[in-house]
């Protein structure tokens, strides 16, 4: 087949006429160095602090150092195949994660991608991981309780909705167990939960997820995971991602609870990134802004007022306040709470629960030290019946600790001192509680009432646990209406007091424990 010159020229004219030119402006740069997950990029202009930079292979890096001639970025993922000379692109976007109800019951990574093998997640959109905390005018005071299900916590260190309560202690003192029990206790309360696991073993996280599933608490919980094998950047960003997912519920007039397990490992990951970016180290080799790292995160946990929720939802939700309660966890070394990160977080939060190794090893679990554990705002939110009854518990324990120290040096004690010691021992025993066995407000009130009104006097110390178990079983079977009333109202009046006295007198007369 031969083409003549006219056909060739017509074909060329046709191609020229249909040729479409599209121009695309791209902010492109070149990798000039790669080391330990940190890349240095030349040629990128107009880059924001915290901007996502697109790398080859559908990966991203986070711009953290903006210098005159280069950009220092931390790779969010594997970096072994990155090399000098590769082209990268600025996206013009800050890091965002998916939010919405579709995340409940799922296990996701720092970027909100599912890692539980249950398929794609239906989200309600994306939100930036770094959001400025609500202002002073947008907040409301904390006056509603959040029940952890632990007698020792709800009676002595009460937590309110929108509070930040630090759980601090050495390794293996029950910090995670306390936080997981608090999540399990919310399964029927309507409070949505977020559990952020930072720098933990994958097997430990799998066990936590399994326990949440066993106790039917996973359905209202989002689990955000950055394991010990994940990049330092992902461990550093995980708490912010989880906080954004929790804020979705707060801003729509609902209540949410978030657990950061733990912020010590996040600080270590941030220190690693900062040192690799050649930022000047300070105390304990942490960078100068490690306080701001945690303060900007924990300030986002708050209770917001009605006008904030109405403005955010554009009038769709009316007359509701929202809250995000934070339970950050800090691991101490040999009980040293005066280290850099623990003191920072103690000063940021609204109280702390100290878990002591010697109490844990002596069999007191949860190992809460009532002497130095405080809640700075939770008292206003405490359920009335528990608040009224628990005042004497803290005093009894404080006096017991003081007298027990003196009793070691003296065998000759008067009757009043001996009675105080016996009462303190029994109250300490009563505060013990098994894991995965949270108690309702009514059950806690009944247990505290029995101690406060002297019903433990004739019960041997070794039988306190059996006494409590039998008392709860008896109350549930014979006085369920009374327990329901206390759980619904939380009030304490003469009628409730008389009913509790009657219940305990009848029960103690049976001696059935």
Swiss-Prot record:
Principal EC category: translocase
Residues holding ATP: 169-176
Pfam family membership, one: ATP-synt_ab_C
GO cellular component, one term: plasma membrane
Site for Required for activity, residues: 373
InterPro entries: ATP_synth_asu-like_sf (IPR023366), ATP_synth_asu_C (IPR000793), ATP_synth_asu_C_sf (IPR038376), ATP_synth_F1_a_nt-bd_dom (IPR033732), ATP_synth_F1_asu (IPR005294), ATPase_a/bsu_AS (IPR020003), ATPase_F1/V1/A1_a/bsu_N (IPR004100), ATPase_F1/V1/A1_a/bsu_N_sf (IPR036121)
Gene3D superfamilies for the chain: 2.40.30.20, ATP synthase alpha/beta chain, C-terminal domain, P-loop containing nucleotide triphosphate hydrolases
Membrane topology: Peripheral membrane protein
Listed GO MF terms: ADP binding; ATP binding; proton-transporting ATP synthase activity, rotational mechanism
Main location: membrane
The reaction(s) this protein catalyses: ATP + H2O + 4 H(+)(in) = ADP + phosphate + 5 H(+)(out)
TM region positions: none
Locations listed in the record: Cell inner membrane
Family: Belongs to the ATPase alpha/beta chains family.
Function: Produces ATP from ADP in the presence of a proton gradient across the membrane. The alpha chain is a regulatory subunit.
Protein name, per record: ATP synthase subunit alpha 2
Organism placement in taxonomy: Bacteria, Pseudomonadati, Pseudomonadota, Gammaproteobacteria, Vibrionales
